[in-house]
Amino acid sequence: MIQEALYQSLNNGINPDECLRIVSKIRKKFSELPIVAITYYNILYKRGLNSFLERSMESGIDGFIVPDIPIEHCNEYVSEASKLGLVTPFLASPNTSESRLRSIASMSSGFLYVISAYGTTGMRKSFEKYTFDNIRNVKRIINSTNVTTSPIPIIVGFGINTPQHAKLMLDSGVDGIIVASKLVDKIKESRNNEAQMLQQIKAIVSSMKKACKEQP
């Protein structure tokens, strides 16, 4: 689904420069809204790491999720991003070893992105027990060691598409959720009716936000 959205965006003439222009418009309207973009390292590399990060910061981006850069090769990226005040969340999956999780957490800033399930992105009807076991394990490791100077927020993503899912994740102890495929699906469904699209997106976000705020 995300890949299909990527192709559609490219066909519509969207590129990194246009994305930065869109972010700039959002930032002017919402000055306090945290904005973390997701991209591939190839874009940063081809456009000049420092140059692109600086332009991104100036447009209003607060950080990047770069899923295809391994922690063994991320020192330059993390260093340059840190100089500009950009956060660098990294991803941890259910099969990430404890030693590697410590390394990932030590290089992450802003938050740690915990992948909820094995497989690819997309909407799921339910989550397995291992999802919640892994969340508890991640919290244990982060809180029981000096991995970071202060406990880093844990955000979980992949497959979350209902308020009930959001509540389950928050009940398990995470600090936030990431929802993507559900929104992409609604954009695709109503792409010829902008008013309807915006109304549906607002309804989804509002219901997720409400579920998160209802946590004790």
Please state what every model-predicted region is:
Residues 23-28, 57, 78-82, 132-149, ...:
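Surface-exposed amphipathic alpha-helices with a cationic face
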Residues 56, 104, 138, 169, ...:
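Conserved, mostly hydrophobic/aromatic
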Residues 96-106, 156, 160-177:
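Catalytic cores of alpha/beta
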Residues 59-65, 69-73, 114-123, 159, ...:
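Glycine-rich phosphate-binding active-site loops on the catalytic face of alpha/beta enzymes
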Residues 56-62, 80-89, 106-114, 172-176:
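Glycine-enriched alpha-helix->loop->beta-strand junction motifs that scaffold or abut catalytic
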Residues 11-26, 44-51, 66-84, 97-102, ...:
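Active-site-adjacent beta->alpha loops and helix N-cap segments on the catalytic face
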Residues 1-4, 183-216:
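C-terminal helical cap(s) of enzyme catalytic domains, especially alpha/beta-barrels
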Residues 35-39, 64-66, 88-92, 112-114, ...:
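Hydrophobic faces of well-ordered beta-strands that scaffold small-molecule active sites
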